[in-house]
Amino acid sequence: MLHKINRLQFIFFAFFSALSANSLAQAIVNIEDLRREGEVGFFTNISASLDAARGNRDRDYYSLQIRFDNNSENAESFLILQQSERKSNNKTMDESTFMHGRYILLGEEGIHWEIFTQYSENPFRNYQKRSVFGAGARYELTNTMRLGAGFLGEDETDLSGKSKTTDRFGFYLHNDFEIAENISFNPTFYFQPSIDDFENDYKASMILAIDFKVNENFKICLL
């Protein structure tokens, strides 16, 4: 019976993995994997990575992340700052800047309220810069499933330098499926349609992740 259940879960994962190629056309940062939900205390984390290679082609890459979390029984909050850059023969090939701050007021009966702000720069990919400010409600549908609904204001500058301000609805659905012992499948779906042009102006993303939990302090995540 257990083998049959695991097989069905694998088929479910493979099916949605096949769909994800088209769904990631407008990538949205997955905040669900960044939460410390239910962990009480103050946490600080600083991580850095540096990679350099010399030869026919010189390659350099660095990334830096600073994170602060402050969680209590009544509220949770976190701030994340990220910066990365990749160069080849002293020419910048990719760079990104990301900042996200969020405050969650924990309510009763599985209904919580949150407010957030986000800023990102990604001039070599989808846009030059994007800033977002929003608020909404977060619902605990089950022990593992979360549903979010709210509003956000978006100010985005595309690769051509054209700026646009848009008010959007924001929806997301997240769940955790246990595939096997210490292995979980974590799909997250985002949908952000324009309030003024619901049918033609929207951003959607389906982010699929598999977590391999090695121990209480270390896990590997595959996207």
Residue ranges of model-derived segments:
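Residues on the lipid-exposed face of transmembrane beta-strands in outer-membrane beta-barrel proteins
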Residues: I46-L50, L64-N70, G101-L105, A135-Y139, ...
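Residues that define the transmembrane beta-barrel architecture of outer-membrane proteins
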Residues: V40-F42, D58-Y62, M93-T97, K129-F133, ...
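Short glycine/proline- and aromatic-enriched beta-strand/turn motifs that initiate or cap beta-hairpins
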Residues: Q26-S72, E76
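Detector for outer-membrane/organellar transmembrane beta-barrel domains
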Residues: E140, T144-P193
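Transmembrane beta-barrel strands of outer-membrane/channel proteins
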Residues: A48-L50, L79-Q83, M99, I115-Y119, ...
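Repeated loop/turn-to-beta-strand initiation elements of outer-membrane beta-barrel proteins
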Residues: F42, N74-L79, E109-W113, T144-L147, ...
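Cleavable N-terminal export/targeting peptides
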Residues: M1-V40
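Sequence/structural signature of outer-membrane beta-barrel proteins
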Residues: S49-G55, N71, Q82-N89, L106, ...
